[in-house]
Amino acid sequence: MKKHYLWMLAAILTFCGPMAFTSCLHVDNSIVKPVKKDYFTRWNSCEALSALQDYVKDVTNPASTNFIKQEDRIVTFDMDGTFIGELYPTYFEYNLLEYRVLEDAAYKNSAPEDVREAAQAIRDFVREGKKLPDHFDMIHAQAAAKAYAGMTLAEFDAYVKAYASKQANGFRGMTYGQSFYKPMLQVFEYLEANGFTNYVVSGSDRFICRALVESIGIEPNRVIGMDVRLRSTNQGLEAGVNYTMGKEENLIRTDELIIKNLKTNKVLQITQEIGKVPVLSFGNSSGDCAMHNFCLSNPTYKSAAFMLIADDEARDHANREKALSLGNQWREAGYHVISMRDDFKTIYGNGVEKTEDSDGRPGVQR
């Protein structure tokens, strides 16, 4: 009898294999509790993080009166200075234009005078601390439209990525393309894990943004930015409504600026492209206030807005006094404030060191 029992047990194990104690013996796996992931290993305990976690816990709880349906969990992130560095010592796209016009042998001798003046203004600001001209955001946008005109989208994407592979000015151990704020990448991951959809809404060129955020998994259709008009290869000056693009044609950039995606333009673009009011918004400057206010005016759902302040002079090229003043301004506006100095355990990750600029630039702060 004992031998018969052992033979039957052996047969069960042989037949069921590794599933013997699950499928064959019907063990209830629902009693096994999943391990909770700590999404914020690069953060210190702080008010802003607690506010974010409390908010997410509330609006994702089906029993809460503040519950938000998953399809309406829309989050908008500014890019420069919000989750990628902008203080080395200026925006990536400004650095790129300076390089394109003043250093790129394939283009610099053919640059129009107004484009050259814009690039030189950036260089004078970076190297000598000279003030940029008033309304330089628009001056730059118009110059950039001209500087990259004629490039196919694939060519421009490759151009941006090639420059992004260069050593980031003012740092050791990091390229421009690696200069993400590591704690903010954890925010992206945390929100996605809780059913939110993250969008990048930047003042920088849409196709620059797409090239930079590709490495962190942001899909191109979730990127909104400055736009120039596109044309197909053989379209010429013919209006798109009158021209049929051929199968062998590519899309190319033109020198016509459509929109600089700052301030209220961000709200207009969000409305046109996403079609929903965000419930969370992240930014770092006055160019993001309209987007934040739009979020906080959400007529249907509880919402929240967060502003980063660049107050860490030890690990980044920051102006603490200016940052603290802005922090007070943002709090008064009803935004949660994230201190890069106090709230981030790291900014760019291990092995990255702030330095004097490798080419002798003084790293002047705005």
Describe the predicted segments one by one.
Residues 10-20:
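Bacterial N-terminal signal peptides
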Residues 18-79, 87, 101, 105-107:
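Non-catalytic pre-domain segments flanking phosphatase-related domains
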Residues 46, 150, 264:
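Electropositive phosphate-/nucleotide-binding environments in soluble metabolic enzymes
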Residues 1-9:
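Bacterial N-terminal signal peptides that target proteins for export
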Residues 28-40, 57, 65-66, 157-366:
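C-terminal cap/substrate-recognition subdomain and adjoining C-terminal extension
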Residues 88-91, 95-177, 182:
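A metal-dependent, Asp-based hydrolase signature
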